[in-house]
Amino acid sequence: MNKNKKIILVAFGSNNLNKSIKRFLFQAEQSKFYDQIKIFKENDFDQKMNNFILKITKEKKRGFGYWIWKPYFVLKVLEESNFGDIVNYADIGCHIIGENKKRFNDYLNILNDENVWLLPFQYKEDYKILNNKYHYPRIEEYKFTKSDLFEYYDCLNNKEIINTPQFWAGSFFIKKTENSLYFMKQWLDIFFKRFDLVDDTNS
């Protein structure tokens, strides 16, 4: 990995998650994986976003605004970073294990390819059984994504997309490029343009 490029951890914790925030920060600092650690809180929203979230959460509590803060804060950090810097987003409930340094470096090496700007993780069948202890259900995109959203992006009948294992938004790596900026803007914009595509209303 290019030593001139920063590795930045991004997370968000609402005001009722202070215990988790402290644990997460401690693990992140102890791991020494990151050049910067940015854990955002409710008072880090700008006025526009704060008003939007307040409006949503009056009636719909899921995900503190249906997780709109994920693309919001990741995009914010990318825009403030240099091209080539890597953001690792992780939910505040994730655990950062310092002993996994080799695996972490493997992820960074994948992103060292100039053609790779996103490293997400999928619920693949390979992960159904872990040490014969944990069993995971099949989680395909079509089971958990609204059909109206598929239709909006013109992929409702594309089985190569809708029948694949769903990508997990709880942790991912994203490198600052023009493509990643466009991707994050698209993710954020859909909340403002068509909120009905991401909420729990019927599709």
Where are these regions (language model features)?
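Glycosyltransferase catalytic domains, chiefly GT-A lineage
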Residues: 1-203
